[in-house]
């Protein structure tokens, strides 16, 4: 054991909790949407994509981590490490880019930067395809030699190699690519789109002399936007910041728990996503009930 056995028990219990909550909520999202035709709208396609991404994380990542935490190290070998790292990264990246597409969709629909634009099923499918292409552009390279997946933190799960500058894997360039393309750019797009969305709502409210209905609508949208941005930051900022610090300070001493705690926040997105993006959607909520 790298750390106290109690830490592995806590890790296993936390993974079990994520599976216990994450699987039913995301599966229910898929089921309810398929059962209720009125939910199958282009704008809801990306919410379904979020649920699929979260299920990838639950089934491909959390179950493996829970199993290996019982042994105190990653017992599934190189192939198992590659598979677990791939599916966990794929699910996380699909979710991340789904949030970007969702932000762009809402900006276009609400702010109307393109006059006479009507959001259709084809646009929704293009958004889904984009999120998958971007996710694969991050999760596949470590399988083919650009960086690699290695056991990380408490050695119970696998992730991209931020820790070493292993010869022949070009880990430095991949970390720079990931941090720029798969964190800073998505963060900038989300802040821009939701910032413009808030401004549009406030302008509309001012134009209507701040009626009670408009004020209530503005508050609902504002609350949703604030939660979206906070959810994104809570999930990804600790993990990205810690990974960047480790990359920039290779050779420094840090314990196994140092990277495990930020990973907890990133993995928790499988619960945050449906809570924020679906449970606060009145249509979904009414159909679930």
From Swiss-Prot:
Entry's Gene Ontology molecular function annotations: 11-cis retinal binding; G protein-coupled photoreceptor activity
PROSITE patterns, per the entry: G_PROTEIN_RECEP_F1_1, G_PROTEIN_RECEP_F1_2, OPSIN
Positions on the Extracellular side per record topology: 1-7, 68-81, 145-173, 246-257
Localization per Swiss-Prot or TrEMBL: Membrane; Cell projection, Cilium, Photoreceptor outer segment
Modification after translation (UniProt): Phosphorylated on some or all of the serine and threonine residues present in the C-terminal region.
Modified residues annotated as N6-(retinylidene)lysine in this record: 267
Nucleus listed as a keyword: no
UniProt entry keywords in alphabetical sequence: Cell projection, Chromophore, Disulfide bond, G-protein coupled receptor, Lipoprotein, Membrane, Palmitate, Phosphoprotein, Photoreceptor protein, Receptor, Retinal protein, Sensory transduction, Transducer, Transmembrane, Transmembrane helix, Vision
Main location: membrane
InterPro entries cross-referenced by the UniProt entry: GPCR_opsins, GPCR_Rhodpsn, GPCR_Rhodpsn_7TM, Opsin, Retinal_BS, Rhodopsin
GO cellular component terms attached to this protein's record: membrane; photoreceptor disc membrane; plasma membrane
Membrane topology field: Multi-pass membrane protein
Motif, 'Ionic lock' involved in activated form stabilization: chain positions: 105-107
GO biological process, one term: G protein-coupled opsin signaling pathway
Residue ranges crossing the lipid bilayer per the database entry: 8-32, 45-67, 82-104, 124-144, 174-195, 224-245, 258-279
Cytoplasmic side: 33-44, 105-123, 196-223, 280-289
Disulfide-linked positions: 81-158
Annotated site residues (Plays an important role in the conformation switch to the active conformation) in this chain: 84
Protein family (similarity comment): Belongs to the G-protein coupled receptor 1 family. Opsin subfamily.
Function: Photoreceptor required for image-forming vision at low light intensity. While most salt water fish species use retinal as chromophore, most freshwater fish use 3-dehydroretinal, or a mixture of retinal and 3-dehydroretinal. Light-induced isomerization of 11-cis to all-trans retinal triggers a conformational change that activates signaling via G-proteins. Subsequent receptor phosphorylation mediates displacement of the bound G-protein alpha subunit by arrestin and terminates signaling.
Name of protein: Rhodopsin
Organism: Comephorus dybowskii
Upper lineage: Eukaryota, Metazoa, Chordata, Craniata, Vertebrata
